[in-house]
Curated annotation (Swiss-Prot):
Keywords of the record: 2Fe-2S, 4Fe-4S, Biotin biosynthesis, Iron, Iron-sulfur, Metal-binding, S-adenosyl-L-methionine, Transferase
Name listed for the protein in its UniProt record: Biotin synthase
Keyword Membrane in record: no
InterPro entries reported in the protein's UniProt record: Aldolase_TIM, BATS_dom, Biotin_synth/BioAB, Biotin_synthase, Elp3/MiaA/NifB-like_rSAM, rSAM
Keyword Transferase annotated: yes
Subunit structure: Homodimer.
Occurrences of domain Radical SAM core (ranges): 54-281
Lineage: Bacteria, Pseudomonadati, Pseudomonadota, Gammaproteobacteria, Pasteurellales
CDD domains xrefs: Radical_SAM
Names of the cofactor(s): [4Fe-4S] cluster; [2Fe-2S] cluster
Pfam families, per database record: BATS, Radical_SAM
Residues binding [4Fe-4S] cluster: C69, C73, C76
Organism: Glaesserella parasuis serovar 5 (strain SH0165)
Role, per record: Catalyzes the conversion of dethiobiotin (DTB) to biotin by the insertion of a sulfur atom into dethiobiotin via a radical-based mechanism.
Length: 335
């Protein structure tokens, strides 16, 4: 038997039984350790079984309430605990938000995502964002919100207002969560995700890589996402954007191949989820992004800003998509 045949046999043995939901961390590590070309090829094969490989879901993200967050996430420039130059801003006017949503739709976005820098919303905040959701939803866009940890009944209120997705990331490997965030726990995140799923909302849940974690810890993050039952409909994979003033401003750069591996492993372990290239894309060369799409990424944030960090300009994204013969999904084509 050839060396390549042995590799194929070994990687085929990694796949859980089709009815199994659980991925052991060691299994995910084995995927990460596959030869790069084998890993990307396998991910591309799985991607094509479930999606049109030339279709990209476009989302636009707007910060509707910026800065002053009580949390101490070491990666986040919106924390009130760090001097990052981000000015605290109150809730944006609903008419302004709707105008931004109209522009996003006209430019090809099928989903409008709204973020508010809260540890968790108060009941009056839910009333405010519910009105905003209804207004944006009336434009024919999918809606997604990221508003922090939810109390009982809040997810149901958001669902009634028309929210489609709730974003609540697991951030990093559960075993190192306390090293990155000290004001909440991994269990707190899981609690809100349970509330969101029980309310009938779709889940957008991913994490951040490049925070000085090991490959094994990246595998732990992917395993924790893949073992959510059911799996998230949308999985944003963020590359750390290092911001001066945050504890992670001097984090070691993540090798680009390791990021592509993360995308590929996310696609293999979550075959039916949309895998999104999220924060950090402005620092990714076009060839790297193309490899990510080959490895199973099929969603991007479209627009020049992600909350408070830079994102590639829309014109640049249009040119890249044309080069790669990719086309945007319309709202009617997104499940």
């Amino acid at each position: 038997m050839t060396t390549y045949s042995l590799r194929l046999k070994a990687k085929n043995e990694l796949t859980p039984h089709p009815t199994a939901q659980y991925w052991r961390k060691c299994q995910v590590e084995e995927l990460f350790d596959l030869p790069f070309m084998d890993l990307v090829f396998r991910a591309a094969e799985i991607h094509r079984q479930h999606f049109d490989p030339n279709a990209i879901q476009l989302s636009t993200l707007l910060s509707i309430k910026t800065g002053g967050c009580a949390e101490d996430c070491e990666y986040c420039p919106q924390s009130a605990r760090y001097d990052t130059g981000v000015e605290k801003q109150s809730m944006l006017d609903v008419n302004y938000i709707v105008e931004k949503a109209q522009i996003a739709k006209a430019r090809g976005a099928s989903r409008f995502c709204m973020g508010a820098a809260w540890r968790g919303p108060k009941p009056k905040d839910i009333e405010t964002v519910s009105a905003i959701i209804k207004a944006v939803k009336s434009l024919g866009l999918e809606t997604c919100g990221t508003f922090g940890m939810l109390e009982e009944g809040m997810a149901e209120d958001l669902k009634e207002a028309g929210l489609d997705y709730y974003n609540h990331n697991l951030d990093t490997d559960p075993e190192r969560y306390h090293q990155v965030i000290h004001t909440r726990s991994h269990d707190d995140r899981m609690d809100t995700l349970g509330k969101v799923r029980s309310a009938g909302l779709k889940i957008c849940c991913g994490g951040i890589v490049g925070m000085n974690e090991t490959r094994a810890e990246r595998a732990g993050l992917i395993a924790s996402l893949a073992n959510l039952d059911p799996q998230p409909e949308s999985v944003p994979i963020n590359q750390l954007v290092k911001v001066a003033g945050t504890p992670l401003e001097n984090a070691e750069d993540l090798d680009w191949t390791e990021f592509v591996r993360t995308i590929a492993v996310a696609r293999i372990t979550m075959p039916k989820s949309y895998v999104r290239l999220s924060a950090g894309r402005s620092n990714m060369p076009e060839a790297m992004q193309a490899l990510c799409f080959m490895a199973g990424a099929n969603s991007i944030f479209y627009g020049d800003k992600l909350l408070t960090t830079e994102n590639p300009e829309e014109d640049g994204d249009r040119v890249l998509m044309e080069k790669l013969n990719l086309y945007p999904l319309s709202c009617s084509n997104v499940e």
